[in-house]
Amino acid sequence: MRARRTSVVMGLILVLGGSLLFAGAGDGLWMTKVPERDRARQNPFDSETNAVAAGAKLFRQNCATCHGGEATGMEKRPNLHSDRIRAATPGELEWLLKNGSMKNGMPSWSRLPEQQRWQIVSYLKSLQ
């Protein structure tokens, strides 16, 4: 009887702990890994009128499979209209695109030229 209760308690601890870990993975903890020099970077394409349209096209080609065509998220992938994305600096978003966050299921897009990553950032910031 005692062994069964211990098993149930341990099971609950594992489920709760796993839930908290999963919740932490998706709550923007990746932002704490962004170096200050990257966080402070400004989008060099901010003033270019075609950057948003170019970024939208790149988003559809590379990101929509996971985040949805309207960037509203799919299954376990986040809605990019969220407060977290609105609050992120352009530098943080470009850093995430470049480095990814495999723990959260976000691949690195370092194979995309830097200009294209910034154009995607322009698009993401336009969603606000």
Where in this protein do the model-derived segments appear?
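Axial heme c-ligation environment in periplasmic c-type cytochrome domains
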Residues: 23-27, 45, 74-81, 98-128
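Bacterial N-terminal signal peptides
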Residues: 10-19
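The canonical Cys-X-X-Cys-His
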Residues: 55, 59-69, 120-124
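Gly/Gly-Pro-rich "capping" loops immediately C-terminal to redox-active cysteine motifs
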Residues: 45, 52-56, 68, 72-98
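Electrostatic cytochrome c docking/interface patches
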Residues: 28-57
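Bacterial N-terminal signal peptides that target proteins for export
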Residues: 2-11
